[in-house]
Amino acid sequence: MENNIQNQCVPYNCLSNPEEILLDGERISTGNSSIDISLSLVQLLVSNFVPGGGFLVGLLDFVWGIVGPSPWDAFLVQIEQLINERIAAYARSAAISNLEGLGNNFNIYVEAFKEWEADPDNPVTRTRVVDRFRILDGLLERDIPSFRIAGFEVPLLSVYAQAANLHLAILRDSSIFGARWGLTTINVNENYNRLIRHIDEYANHCADTYNRGLNNLPKSTYQDWITYNRLRRDLTLTVLDIAAFFPSYDNRRYPIQSVGQLTREIYTDPLITFNPQLQSVAQLPTFNVMESNAIRTPHLFDVLNNLTIFTDWFSVGRNFYWGGHRVISNRIGGGNITSPIYGREANQEPPRSFTFNGPVFRTLSNPTFRPLQQPWPAPPFNLRGVEGVEFSTPLNSFTYRGRGTVDSLTELPPEDNSVPPREGYSHRLCHATFVQRSGTPFLTTGPVFSWTHRSATDRNIIYPDVINQIPLVKAFNLTSGTSVVRGPGFTGGDIIRTNVNGSVLSMSLNFSNTTLQRYRVRVRYAASQTMVMSVTVGGSTTGNQGFPSTMSANGALTSQSFRFAEFPVGISASGSQGASISISNNVGRQMFHLDRIEFLPVTSTFEEEYDLERAQEAVNALFTSTNQLGLKTDVTDYHIDQVSNLVECLSDEFCLDEKRELSEKVKHAKRLSDERNLLQDRNFRSINGQLDRGWRGSTDITIQGGDDVFKENYVTLPGTFDECYPTYLYQKIDESKLKSYTRYELRGYIEDSQDLEIYLIRYNAKHEIVNVPGTGSLWPLSIENSIGPCGEPNRCAPHLEWNPNLDCSCRDGEKCAHHSHHFSLDIDVGCTDLNEDLGVWVIFKIKTQDGHARLGNLEFLEEKPLLGEALARVKRAEKKWRDKREKLEWETNIVYKEAKESVDALFVNSQYDRLQADTNIAMIHAADKRVHRIREAYLPELSVIPGVNAGIFEELEGRIFTAYSLYDARNVIKNGDFNNGLLCWNLKGHVDVEEQNNHRSVLVVPEWEAEVSQEVRVCPGRGYILRVTAYKEGYGEGCVTIHEIEDNTDELKFSNCVEEEVYPNNTVTCNDYTATQEEYGGAYTSRNHGYGKSYESNSSVQADYASVYEEKADTDGRRDNHCESNRGYGDYTPLPAGYVTKELEYFPETDKVWVEIGETEGTFIVDSVELLLMEE
């Protein structure tokens, strides 16, 4: 009876919500926070396993900087809910409290480390980082045992792994940087020994506890297997994956970056719909069936290529579902492997075959439960199956029947959530197994997906600049007697077991270097007896080498069981090569375990010996004696950096001890160089970073990191379009650092320059213009590896050398800058006076459009005491300077008094907050002109540097600016000087705004029908003065009218043919007004800002004003400076004849008036319009 059939579909997520699990009657949302954090950490360990601040910051960002009490609790709950076991309250509280404390102390340690890394020679930073290390190290030694409290080891295991990883990271820091921190050799070695001991201890605990946690779970029902698999998966992600990288913290075994891979397989939940609260497990496979059918036996690593799905159906209601499938994969370097049929090769629909051509990083599945009512008298039938899946690769999606809602990313989230999942995914689909159970009246079927970590690449790529770790399960062939077995838990995947006496395995390698490169080879192994092994790559072999036993016969595999078989003879290879491992002398057929093979790039012996000898000679030549107490005076900072490059390029494999010794000597030389250098911020950390010290410069200067010429930061100075506003860089050497009657030297290195001016200024200016032609890159065209993999310069590649000895002499015993890359300029210092604090100004300047410069390694250091002629010469220069200073002080007193009186007359009181009622713009300009008669307010060589009279000049100039601001506040006309074009003005017809005489803007009304107007808000009943400065050309009249809506109209008329009545002192008003407007060129508010900012508070305006005058003021009288006239402080151009100023009084009756500008004939030119509020 067809109409009695009921076909009901219950969605997967309605029956079982994987995000919520009941534990002791409490519903807990699990989420994936701990898994997210662990995946991000693994990404860091895979991609950036390099000691230093970058790694520590990553560790802080990914783990310790984002977790707090709640996330740490989530780590614990994640496991608690799976094993159905609560941690005792005291243990939980202690663990979370300890984790918080460790996180806080790690944050402080990272701050101290970064501070030391930025200033490694500072004893304060060294002391701080050592103190923070010892505190954090002590806390970790104390607290890690609290994460393995007896009885709660399993739920605490994920936080144990995080704390252990942190401890190994800082122990590695102390082993690498301890000597530079000031730790003794004994202390450094002790820390290294603890590091090695803890690597084994922590790895063993993680693996043992993992296995114990799984063994303690029940293993009977389907639901037992679900819990078992989830715990296995979660502990793999949060514990074992991290523990797999513990051995890489051995910095002496991994002195450079290493790249590891995780080949383990993990399984997402079966795509079977089941609700344990409502349904019986009798219709589902048992634990043993699930484990044997869903989990693959250990095997060589393979890559999924194709998946063919067969569709089955249940006749009642024609319900189609995934009935079976076949997988085609390949081993790396091997051919395709076709799996047996999983499930049934059904044919209810044509098979669907998917060739992915890329990693499948996501599945969206549609598992369903359909309770079907069969025709009477048949019993109801429960059908569980998968009705559709969408497979996603980074480029495409492949859909079998339909897309579902069960997302694999909920169980295996991305490792990087800052990018789309197609880029930040953590796992890729590796295989699909199948489980089913049928009976009366039910059928349960569903695929189970297995996944591998993305770090396990689909090729065995060997890079020439890192230590390459290749798991041996990535071989493509094993000989008889060799097999893959389960890994012990801390290896990141399965391992190889063999008892052969001969060839063990074959694998395919891809060397990224296209020319022959030499590599050292080592194999991680465990053996109960001596083993003789060899590795062959292409036509190159290591030869047979004997290696000792590592464990007792039949002993358990622990972290201590594994050691490295390091071959003294390396191999040479490039491109694609086959590789094999062989074992000989295994007559007794003892069992050996092999984990991974590692390739370490090395150079030839001859080159290594030559480089070592060359580096030793260069280092010894830096010092005055063999005890390295002092540097030779002619050893420059740049030369020390080049010697440092020589040492850094020595082979770690060939001469590691010698390299370390030479490196310490070079570092000592660098510290001595820094100590004698009187410049602040010698490494260009910032420009304008600190107001009272360091480098100051124009904003167009850039600081760039080291390149093929400079090891450290250097600066680039571009050209300028206006020589009055040059590109500049300067610093003052404080008087307290100088010695009396001593010669000092400025020197450095110029990569290239054009029109670079260098000044040393004390009593007078020592000045040189330096043009140094650049030679382009130091790398010859034949060198292919001049750039490293991250874009950094490869300073170890062969390169061209410039002559470091070029120099020239200006006078016997003196030095000057010239056209060589090394420049030197000296200056003599007479008697020092801390009160005067004259110091020495170091200036670099470019004032041409084609000018440019790149320079670094700057030094200012003591050269020698002055004697004889040089001493007499500096004394004469000092006396001449003091005579000039006395004359200047006498002149300044007179000029200052006049200027101050003129400025004070503008205001009503000494608070300078209110103008006199009769103060007009002409009076302000006249006072300003007197202020600018003060000489030596700024240095003529660079007008941003304050001179001897800067204080009094800025004092008066600040009051002048206040006067301008107060005057502007009385003028209610916006943009009355037309410096902002026609902004705020209404326009009818055609008018122009033109620039005349030093960028002064005027309004030109050329046509009688044109009109310009502005609506102005006023205060009814108050008095206003309308003042207009204008010029009329030709016949007719120019008119400026002010009126209200109705009546109350007044106007000012301008004519060219009739002598107009002018305001008193009209000529002075016109000329001074124009001249001083040109002088300021935008220095005060209404000329320097749009009107959105013109009426802000004086405090914000003053800040802008200070920078303007720091840039522009230049009245030093040391030499003629033609930029003075351009800035308005020398000769100025008055208004042409005919400009007049008129004004009238106006009393509005409403709050709104209109000011209109027009003419009757000819051309009307308006310089400014002012509407001033009368004083009450």
From Swiss-Prot:
Molecular functions per Gene Ontology: signaling receptor binding; toxin activity
Record has Hydrolase as a keyword: no
Biological processes, Gene Ontology terms: sporulation resulting in formation of a cellular spore; symbiont-mediated killing of host cell
InterPro entries: Cry1Ac-like_dom-VII, Cry_V, Galactose-bd-like_sf, Pest_crys, Pest_crys_Cry1Aa_dom-IV, Pest_crys_dom-III, Pest_crys_dom_I, Pest_crys_N_sf
Pfam families assigned: Cry1Ac_D5 (PF17997), Cry1Ac_dom-VII (PF21463), Endotoxin_C (PF03944), Endotoxin_C2 (PF18449), Endotoxin_M (PF00555), Endotoxin_N (PF03945)
Keywords, alphabetical: Sporulation, Toxin, Virulence
Family: Belongs to the delta endotoxin family.
Function: Promotes colloidosmotic lysis by binding to the midgut epithelial cells of insects. Toxic to Spodoptera exigua and Trichoplusia ni.
Misc remark: Toxic segment of the protein is located in the N-terminus.
UniProt name for this protein: Pesticidal crystal protein Cry1Cb
Organism expressing this protein natively: Bacillus thuringiensis subsp. galleriae
Lineage, uppermost ranks: Bacteria, Bacillati, Bacillota, Bacilli, Bacillales
